[in-house]
């Protein structure tokens, strides 16, 4: 395995953060912890229900880690929406992460998908059954146009995960395949449309801005994720079907060339995102900026992405990019580094056990000693 291109990664990250003028001021520390705990608590109780536990069949530690990651993403990035909307989105996106980590073949349970949908019957696929049950709680926050985007993008995501079950990075020469798969499983339209709850935005009045935001967010959000995930995925056997690796296969180029391709497209998208909305509705621009900055903070601070390892590796280096990266990392950590023990309690497994015993009051107590074990 070749060595990770640290210097290149530092330069790319610094340029990205400079392009978006990174300065996360979305919350005070108290507000961040309050929103994290509210969204987490509602979502944890949701996934602790017997039906969810029985149908999802997810390892408790994996479910706990997935929920904490997603709550962080939503709270940090969807800074303008209500706490209730944050909680409902956290549940929805946790379902998507659970599916993304699944290895079950969806084919048998999807044979009668449309017939069941048309007849109003419960879906045979357990993931769809649970997601459809929760969808009204999500869609109540949005107008019909944004809701349609959420539904359609979630269906695309399911199909993208289905394709990934085959561990297929594309045929050499199939230049369209990498971006096709990344758009399919990126949830870009779902994310882009879920920034505009109807209590804050009239989707008819802001239709053009919202449509453009959905279009721009489709690429920006997934490309930034791919760049910030590149380190953790570099030598992980489970993450070899990535956009960068698929560029290598389909475009028949080197890994360095593939990373440069992603870098240039991400930086161009970042420039566009800032420029296009600079003279538009100030509330729209503020929402987009808060999302961009919060999304970056989440990546820099969430243990899943292991970027603290890069920081520790280069913090004593004297290069300009190393110093800039460390400054940005410290800036993010100052606002976003919040220990799970401060908000992610009680654990889902504990709630599920308490529900089984019927002791609801006991379920409200924090269990800080065990929560620290979950990254």
From Swiss-Prot:
Pathway(s): Sesquiterpene biosynthesis; trichothecene biosynthesis
Keywords: Lyase
Keyword Transmembrane helix: no
SUPFAM superfamilies in UniProt: Terpenoid synthases
Signal peptide per UniProt: none
Any Gene Ontology biological process: sesquiterpenoid biosynthetic process
EC class: lyase
Disulphide linkage map: none
InterPro entries from the UniProt entry: Isoprenoid_synthase_dom_sf (IPR008949), TRI5_ascomyc (IPR010458), Trichodiene_synth (IPR024652)
Coiled coil: none
Example of a GO MF term: trichodiene synthase activity
Family recorded in the similarity comment: Belongs to the trichodiene synthase family.
Protein name: Trichodiene synthase
Organism, as annotated: Fusarium asiaticum
Top-level taxonomy: Eukaryota, Fungi, Dikarya, Ascomycota, Pezizomycotina
């Amino acid at each position: 395995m070749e060595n990770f291109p640290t210097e290149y990664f530092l330069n790319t990250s610094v340029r990205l953060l400079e392009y978006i003028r990174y300065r996360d001021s979305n919350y005070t520390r108290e507000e961040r912890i309050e929103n994290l705990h509210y969204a987490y608590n509602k979502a944890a109780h949701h996934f602790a229900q017997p039906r969810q536990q029985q149908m999802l069949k997810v390892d408790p530690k994996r479910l706990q880690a997935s929920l904490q990651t997603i709550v962080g993403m939503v709270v940090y990035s969807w800074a303008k929406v209500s706490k209730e909307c944050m909680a409902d989105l956290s549940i929805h996106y946790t379902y998507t992460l659970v599916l993304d980590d699944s290895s079950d073949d969806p084919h048998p349970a999807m044979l009668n998908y449309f017939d069941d949908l048309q007849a109003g019957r419960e879906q045979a696929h357990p993931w769809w059954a649970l997601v459809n049950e929760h969808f009204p709680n999500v869609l109540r926050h949005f107008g019909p146009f944004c809701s349609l985007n959420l539904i359609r993008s979630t269906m695309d995501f399911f199909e993208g995960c289905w394709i990934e079950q085959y561990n297929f990075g594309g045929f050499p020469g199939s230049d369209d395949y990498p971006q096709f798969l990344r758009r399919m499983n990126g949830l870009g339209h779902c994310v882009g449309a879920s920034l505009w709850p109807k209590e804050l935005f009239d989707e008819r009045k802001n239709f053009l801005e919202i449509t453009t935001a959905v279009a721009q967010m489709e690429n920006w959000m997934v490309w930034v994720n791919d760049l910030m995930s590149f380190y953790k995925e570099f030598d992980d056997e489970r993450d070899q079907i990535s956009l960068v690796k698929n560029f290598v296969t389909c475009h028949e180029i080197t890994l360095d060339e593939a990373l440069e391709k992603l870098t240039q497209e991400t930086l161009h998208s970042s420039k566009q995102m800032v420029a296009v909305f600079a003279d538009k509705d100030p509330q729209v621009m503020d929402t987009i900026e808060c999302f961009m900055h919060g999304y970056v903070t989440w990546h820099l601070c969430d243990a899943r992405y292991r970027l603290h390892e890069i920081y520790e590796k280069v913090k004593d280096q004297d290069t300009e990019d190393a110093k800039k990266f460390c400054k940005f990392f410290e800036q993010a950590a100052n606002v976003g580094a919040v220990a799970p023990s401060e908000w992610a309690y009680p654990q889902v497994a504990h709630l599920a056990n308490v529900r089984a015993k019927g002791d609801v009051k006991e379920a409200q107590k924090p269990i800080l000693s065990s929560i620290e074990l979950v990254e």
